[in-house]
Amino acid sequence: MAKIVDCFADRPIIVGSGLAGLIAALTISPEPSVLVTRSALGAETSSAWAQGGMSVSLSPDDNPSLHLADTLAAGDGLCDAVAAESIILEALDAFHVLQHFGIHFDQDSNGHLALGLEAAHSRRRIVHVGGDRSGTAIVQALTACVLNDPSITVLEGLEARHILMADNVVCGLLLANPTSEIVLPSSRILLATGGIGGLYDATTNPVNNFGQGIAMAARAGAVLADMEFVQFHPTALHCHNRPLALVSEAVRGEGAVLINERGERFMADIPGAELAARNIVAQAISAEITRGGQVFLDARQALGARFSTRFPTITALCHKVGIDPVHMPIPVCPAAHYHMGGIATDRQGRSSIPGLWVAGEAASTGLHGANRLASNSLLEAVVMGTRAARDITSHNTPHPLGTIPITPKKPDTTLIRPIVSQCLGVLRHAADMHRAIAALLPFVEGEEESSDPAIVALLIAIFAHLRTESRGAHARTDFPLKHDTTQRRNMTLEDVLEIAHSRIAQRKEKIS
């Protein structure tokens, strides 16, 4: 039986210690809060692994309108333009917030900010730290600030398993580790639980990040949005490791080119070439690999000996697998990298459930649309983590605890990953998605270790099945064209389960 811990009663609870969670905790301060993380503070987060940096218009030839135009173009018609504009207009504030917490962004030899160029950006607007160590440096600095803030209680080694509800509002959170189970009573929970890359064999995310926050919110009845849109980073370091190391877009921004095993530059005739939007590059690389080829990122001519100083982290990662990027092309492949979909939120990070806020990759704000513009994720994490935190401090209506359920088993993705990897990858087809739905539904309804990962996977499968077009990161070989008009889709888990049962019944009728 879970132990109720009353000493933190009604404090805001933040789940996750990536950029959004850390910023939220620091923003809520000096009001006391509790930050829950399943591992060490700041560890096992996608934020800490970010190489590129954060997008912000700072150069004389740039402005927020150009940044917005690039964001909307990458989003392929599905961005919420109002939400996107509001976030981008706060980019400069986000930049100053990070500076306030001790982050020193790279400068050029003249003492000016060094601005990087990444795919689908029309201007150099990526601020970075330590070359390609932006995420690590930012998370380390914010982690130190959190640990030095007496108003923030950090609970490490505890995994959020269930959002407790009473009368359709949040009343607490059930946490567990291998030796204990506890309940934190609270009417204010902020999920900053990251993405879903752990559902895939090939991912650049921490392998335990399968969308736990999405699964918990879905069980609680939250509205989900745009779940079909999974961004595959085009250039993960192709090797036998899991997760795969990221070879940042910034390498292509510095002039590196993509070649196949024959030395052909297959992106040369595609608009934008190597700096086309991520979905375009990922799909082109996937097509090369599908035909039995290999793909390499060649920086020898563009960077040469400068590679190791501009990209020290990538250099070290390459050396670990026997690649010298100064003298050798880097083998690359697409890998699940970022989820544009998630828990639907409003401008303040509120979900459809009273008492539940969401920030960072777990949320669907409308900024990214069908395809995220590079380095907009760190921007969104800072802006929305700040907004949600400020909104949380203006709400505090305690609710008594409802029924405490039996603690769900520790989630395990082992049986789900093969289904997702084979059926919901870069290129999709109705037949594969039908197989995924049929395979996932028993796991969803089985309430075993695979149940929560299966919920997230089923959400992706049903949303993808219903979008009968190719748009942004959602590419269907049976529907290769875009519709003239389109819209974002919002559904609950109840909606998705009803559709899943209906589709399976229809398939059985056709077979019989």
Swiss-Prot record:
Cofactors (names): FAD
Keywords: Cytoplasm, FAD, Flavoprotein, Nucleotide-binding, Oxidoreductase, Pyridine nucleotide biosynthesis
Coiled coil: none
GO BP: any one term: 'de novo' NAD biosynthetic process from L-aspartate
Pfam families: FAD_binding_2, Succ_DH_flav_C
Listed SUPFAM superfamilies: FAD/NAD(P)-binding domain, Succinate dehydrogenase/fumarate reductase flavoprotein C-terminal domain, Succinate dehydrogenase/fumarate reductase flavoprotein, catalytic domain
Nucleotide-binding listed as a keyword: yes
Its biological purpose: Catalyzes the oxidation of L-aspartate to iminoaspartate, the first step in the de novo biosynthesis of NAD(+).
Family note: Belongs to the FAD-dependent oxidoreductase 2 family. NadB subfamily.
Protein name: L-aspartate oxidase
